[in-house]
């Protein structure tokens, strides 16, 4: 497995190592998701959200940008705080139950994306800073599947998340994508970690 040593694999949940992902139902509570969405919609209504510039916060409504029909925030204080506060809970969820010892995770970055109708996510795997990643559904108007490559079967698996559900995945190893969104909006938080050597 690229980028993750045998020693690191032994620290991780066997399903995470074998399949490349774990579904964590109700990882965030409903009130927490509601709060995060309230903050997101307040940010969307702010003057800074008008006009998209590639690589910055804003809504990308044209076809030339990397993330068509999305509004993105990278490293915002609320998401960075969440990245650090959830570190131990994420390590607990990722641990190998046989050892009982959570892996040591180092936070790398946080990212939030609000997808608008027609948005899609191209097939990709993540950069080296994303060894263990979570994508967390904060809210939606409609269900929207994410497809992840199952490392065992080498086939795509459809995952449907409800608000509060998290998908933990080995970001450098697992390809993933979303088809065009058939709904008004879908709010997703990404938190990324690397494993201690």
Per-segment meaning from a language model:
Residues 3, 193-197:
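Short amphipathic alpha-helical segments
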Residues 1-93:
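Non-heme Fe(II)/2-oxoglutarate
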Residues 15-18, 106, 185:
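A short, polar/charged loop/turn motif at coil->beta-strand junctions and beta-hairpin connectors
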Residues 114-174, 185-189, 196:
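Catalytic core of non-heme Fe(II) oxygenases with the double-stranded beta-helix
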Residues 64-72, 82-147:
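Conserved double-stranded beta-helix
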Residues 178-183:
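Short proline/glycine-enriched turn/loop segments at secondary-structure junctions
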Residues 23-25, 168, 192:
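Short, well-ordered beta-strand micro-motif
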């Amino acid at each position: 497995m690229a980028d993750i040593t045998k020693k690191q694999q032994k620290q991780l949940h066997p399903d995470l190592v074998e399949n490349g992902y774990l579904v964590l139902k109700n990882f965030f509570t409903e009130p927490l998701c509601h709060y995060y969405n309230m903050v997101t919609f307040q940010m969307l209504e702010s003057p800074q959200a008008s006009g998209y510039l590639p690589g910055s916060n804003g809504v990308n409504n044209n076809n030339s940008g990397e993330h068509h029909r999305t509004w993105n925030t990278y490293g915002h204080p609320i998401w960075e705080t969440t990245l650090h506060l959830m570190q131990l809970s994420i390590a607990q969820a990722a641990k190998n139950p046989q050892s009982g010892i959570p892996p040591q995770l180092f936070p790398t970055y946080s990212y939030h994306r609000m997808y608008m109708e027609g948005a899609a996510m191209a097939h990709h795997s993540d950069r080296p800073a994303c060894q263990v990643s979570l994508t967390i559904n904060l809210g939606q108007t409609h269900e929207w599947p994410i497809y992840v490559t199952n490392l065992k079967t080498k086939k795509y698996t459809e995952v449907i998340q409800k608000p509060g559900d998290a998908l933990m995945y080995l970001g450098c190893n697992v390809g993933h994508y979303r088809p065009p969104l058939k709904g008004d909006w879908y709010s997703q938080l990404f938190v990324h970690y690397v494993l201690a050597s």
